[in-house]
């Protein structure tokens, strides 16, 4: 018997064999599934077969086992589905929430009979991934890659995450697009949840808003509908209690309602980002946060809303996290095991693993063993594997002896100037840095910019938004909006200001606006047949607004330094025209009549 799930907006039918059979928009009766061959709604992926008989009969490789049967029992919140698969000798239990304007699917449990893996000492089932949703939909006029929504003037169909853990994606075909949501073992299988929205286009953002409120997500819809999202921002890297009045004067002269303060306004820095992570207050703040609070009160009193610009994943190579003892929570892109003891005077490091592909840029050739940082000149790619020409005690770290078998690694040095490295988001260091940022933010900031967001660990589609979210979650009060240097699916909920094209100096600013964000905006509107729309702007098709670039922002301080260079420490207040900085994002307003993209998908 088919499984029928119905809410106020749509009716979803899954066949008894596990395929999506129909998705009807109730207001019009439109069928929203592709007429192509049905696709299994659920599936499970294993790295190889583990059941002995399946392993012997089939190739040992990463394999997808599609659903081949479903049975349903109703629950107070919707339904509980028990799903079986081709060949895989177990079943999945999926909880379905039927909300008025969305359906949510969460992996609740597994049913593994004793006969499935007899005598094997292993965790069962050996699932690497579980597909929560697979939906084949026909192409529509627009596709928003960021939120994973296909829409036109009449209807919108979207598969999106209900928490930070699922991998959300799509695959375009000639006549259709496959929307998918997957729970991943290394992040979370049980409890991972994704949602399906099928709605009239005019009601789509309302449905997303319901999901955000029900699952206590950042309020992306509410933020995109606020007046603040459309305001220009005045940016400065050198606003302090001593010169804040001049900055306010320039901002008011330019008509700016928002002022974005780079973290160097508050904290000591040198050599690019070399001290990032310390968050030591500048001398101009003897009372630290209290001095910042009084300065921000002045900005608020002038009718300007202050925001904080920071790099939340960067750790400066001269910070206390790197020297004199490098923190074990710094991210290593490769791991190496010492094949011989490393004594204090040694300049050759012998390891068990092949260093092929290790960093060749001289600024990035840094190994970490224990608390010591070591640079190298070269390495061998045949046994014995060796790093040669090593300089011990780099960046003032303590030179030590290291025993055979000690595991170290290649430090994840930031590509932006190599004055910092990236922290490991799987450790407590991300939360430790978030606490420092939140303490400063609480002095009176109301929005923020997640700079350096691309500096995360793989899988990037999870860790880029999750690193932002771990900071966002600690900020009080919640930001009116945020911007970032990178985004992925879950960022949509908190990164309502989008991405900033933020490295261009004044002399080329207008040219770069035309080359990048101005080119991006109309591309967001194209029918994406067989191609992926970049980034993520699109939005409510019938809300009466369009989106373009946020108007050009100016600052009275020096222009933002290119990544990896030191912010200017000059106390001189330059005219605004000498320090224009781009904040090109997609928001809910059109930019001076330019071709624009819809707001916010």
For the regions a language model picked out, list residue spans one by one.
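Active-site-proximal substrate-binding groove within the catalytic cores of carbohydrate-active enzymes
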Residues: 14-17, 468-601
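N-terminal accessory beta-strand-rich subdomains and adjacent acidic, glycine-rich linkers
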Residues: 1-224, 549-550
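Mobile, glycine- and charge-enriched loop segments
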Residues: 211-240, 359, 364-368, 384, ...
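Flexible loop/turn segments at secondary-structure boundaries
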Residues: 266-271, 313-318, 375, 397, ...
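Short, flexible loop/turn elements at secondary-structure junctions
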Residues: 85-87, 98-100, 109-111, 265, ...
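Autoprocessing Asn-cyclization modules and mimics
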Residues: 312-399
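Aromatic-lined carbohydrate-binding/catalytic grooves of carbohydrate-active enzymes
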Residues: 226-335, 412-438, 443-458, 462-466
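Carbohydrate-binding surfaces of carbohydrate-active enzymes
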Residues: 292-316, 321, 329-337, 343-345, ...
């Amino acid at each position: 018997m088919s499984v029928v799930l119905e809410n106020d907006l749509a009716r979803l039918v899954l066949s008894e064999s596990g395929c999506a059979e129909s998705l009807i928009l109730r207001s019009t009766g439109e069928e929203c599934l592709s007429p192509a061959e049905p696709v299994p709604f659920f599936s499970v992926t294993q790295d190889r077969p583990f059941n002995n008989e399946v392993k012997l009969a089939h190739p040992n490789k990463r394999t997808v086992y599609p659903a081949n049967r479903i049975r349903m029992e109703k629950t107070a919140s919707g339904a509980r589905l028990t799903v079986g698969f081709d060949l895989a000798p177990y079943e999945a239990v999926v909880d379905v929430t039927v909300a008025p304007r969305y359906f949510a699917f969460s992996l609740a449990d597994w049913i593994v009979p004793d006969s499935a893996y007899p005598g094997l000492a292993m965790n069962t089932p050996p699932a690497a991934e579980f597909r929560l949703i697979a939906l084949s939909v026909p192409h529509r006029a627009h596709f928003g890659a960021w939120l994973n929504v296909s829409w036109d003037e009449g209807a919108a169909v979207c598969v999106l995450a209900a928490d930070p853990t699922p991998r959300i994606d799509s695959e375009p075909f000639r006549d259709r697009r496959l929307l998918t949501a997957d729970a991943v073992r290394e992040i979370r299988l049980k409890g991972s949840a994704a949602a399906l929205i099928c709605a009239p286009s005019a009601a789509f953002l309302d449905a997303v808003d319901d999901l955000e409120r029900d699952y206590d997500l950042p309020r992306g819809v509410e933020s995109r509908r606020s007046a603040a999202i459309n305001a220009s921002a005045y940016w400065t890297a050198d606003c302090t209690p001593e010169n804040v009045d001049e900055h306010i004067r320039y901002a008011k002269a330019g008509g700016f309602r928002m002022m974005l303060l780079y973290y160097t306004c508050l904290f000591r820095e040198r050599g690019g980002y070399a001290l990032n992570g310390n968050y030591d207050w500048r001398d101009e703040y003897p009372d630290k946060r209290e001095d910042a609070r009084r300065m921000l009160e002045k900005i608020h009193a002038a009718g300007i809303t202050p925001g904080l610009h920071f790099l939340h994943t960067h750790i400066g190579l001269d910070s206390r996290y790197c020297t004199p003892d490098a923190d074990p929570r710094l991210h290593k892109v490769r791991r190496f095991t010492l094949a011989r003891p490393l004594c204090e005077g040694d300049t050759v490091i012998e390891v068990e693993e092949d260093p092929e592909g290790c960093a060749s840029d001289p600024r990035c050739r840094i190994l970490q063993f224990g608390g010591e940082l070591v640079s190298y000149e070269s390495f061998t790619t045949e046994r014995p594997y060796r790093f040669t020409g090593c300089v011990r005690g780099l960046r003032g770290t303590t030179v030590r002896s290291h025993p055979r078998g000690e595991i170290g690694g290649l430090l994840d040095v930031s590509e932006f100037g190599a004055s910092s490295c990236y922290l490991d988001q799987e450790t407590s260091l991300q939360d430790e840095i978030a606490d420092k940022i939140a303490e400063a933010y609480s002095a009176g900031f109301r929005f923020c910019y997640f700079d350096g967001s691309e500096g995360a660990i793989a899988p990037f589609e999870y860790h880029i938004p999750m690193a932002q979210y771990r900071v966002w979650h600690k900020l009080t009060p919640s930001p009116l909006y945020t911007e970032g240097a990178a985004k992925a699916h879950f960022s949509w909920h908190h990164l309502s200001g989008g991405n900033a094209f933020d490295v261009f100096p004044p002399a080329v600013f207008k040219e770069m606006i035309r080359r990048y964000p101005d080119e991006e905006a109309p591309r967001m509107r194209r029918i994406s047949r067989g191609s992926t729309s970049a980034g993520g702007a699109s939005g409510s098709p019938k809300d009466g607004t369009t989106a373009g670039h946020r108007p050009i922002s100016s600052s009275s301080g020096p222009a933002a330094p290119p990544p990896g260079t030191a912010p200017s420490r000059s106390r001189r207040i330059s005219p605004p025209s000498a320090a224009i900085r781009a904040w090109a994002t997609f928001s809910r307003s059109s930019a001076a009549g330019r071709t624009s993209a819809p707001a916010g998908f």
